[in-house]
Amino acid sequence: MLLLPIVHALIVLWLAVYGLNSFVLVFIYLRHRRTVTPTPPIDRSALPPVTIQAPVYNELHVVERVIDAVAALDYPLDRLQIQILDDSTDETTRLARARAAFHRERGVDVTVLKRPKREGFKAGALDWGLSQASGECAAKGEYIAMFDADFCPRPDFLLRTVPHFLHHPRLGMVQTRWSYLNADYSPITRAQVLALDGHFVVEQLGRHRGGLLMSFNGAGGVWRRRCIDESGGWQADTLCEDLDLSYRAQLAGWQCLYLPSVDAPAEVPPQIAAFKRQQSRWAQGSVQALRKLAGPILRSQRLGWGQKAMALVHLSSYLAHPLMVLVLLASLPLLLLPNFDSISFSGLGLVSLGPPLLYAISQQRLHPDWGRRMRAFPLLAMIGIGIAWSNTRAVWRGLIHWGGTFARTPKFRLEGRGGGWTDSGYRLRADVNTIVEVALALYALATAFVAYRTGNYGVIPFSLVYALAFGTVAGLGLAQTLAPRRGGARRAVRQDAAKEC
């Protein structure tokens, strides 16, 4: 027990590193925020062949929308190929084939591909589309644009991204900024959008302009096919195949470009259970990428020590969640130790202001009413802490296993504030993590009570925030599990499924 205060202090300092990281990225962003990357001149006759890949798995609500969107891209039809990489086991396949046939009749080269076996999940599908599809279905493009099933790219997407490759022979990947079709659907979606805007507006721009390693976000981007091949291709040993490949490409000497002025609209999940599933997948995959790439990063002769340190902080960012759980669990025993005076959280101090500053800057950059949008921050903070337990389990899986099950995030064709999800067979329900979250909320309340009784008043706010956070996430999960079916909502979506976005 004598080591417990030391361990607690070290964990608090470790958490402070992630807060400091936000300040570093904000500083880099502010230095470079006025730098603009203009789109090179476009000579339509010189545009190269492009293959669009859209991996799909049981997405009957949105599959027709994404096919319509990519078929409407402004690009020479004789140099545009669309692969719908369909691993679905439900009605999605029929809908996709019918919509693809509709566009083929209008001269668009769009094909729905079914591989013999669903191996490697998304990474396996992308690799199969590039390397194993044969005949007319084989990928023909020199450049590969990727969109998940819930994306709805704007018609000029390729014209604003592909020309950059023609002027930079070592450019391997272009990532664009995500925007959101259903940002204002609910408080949960507004909170997620605030977090994602912070990543895309400040973090990605800071990493790119600061000469740091940056990530591909899995969709809304374009790759040079030669870069994919020379960097080892898509690999399924991590659940973040996008993060893995983008780091391997940069370690191999390829350059990446981030274009904040080009946006790719997509959907964010309305369910807290879906958000937790998504975050768990990213947590597990990021830790697997850390295990896989930490050695090559440290040995790289291309990177300075500052770049290496920032890369490791980036890959390890989800370790913050088990650290948060450990801080909470250690606090109560510390309070009960004889002759122990107080628990200090001074290591978090000002650095805890890093994330909210980052979010505020992102909203100020994007929206005139940024102050109103920052009202989502309290809920985001509660959710960010409240998912710590489910992400802790995911981090543990990432530390002891390679690969894993790619549990998709269900999407429901929600646009603006319209649409519904309660009648869908894809809706998720609360799981065993909810029970643990309730237990952790009660544990945090007990810690606050003991802190009051022992005179450690500085621990009380910390404990109450944890109690509120775990209680919020558990409560949202239970409320959405018990939400009644609305009736007719899915029929309305299906009838309108062919509408262009």
Where are these regions (language model features)?
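N-proximal low-complexity "stem/linker" segments adjacent to membrane-targeting elements
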Residues: 1-68
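A conserved acidic beta->alpha catalytic loop
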Residues: 76, 86-96, 116-119
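Donor nucleotide-sugar recognition loop
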Residues: 229-247, 256, 263-264
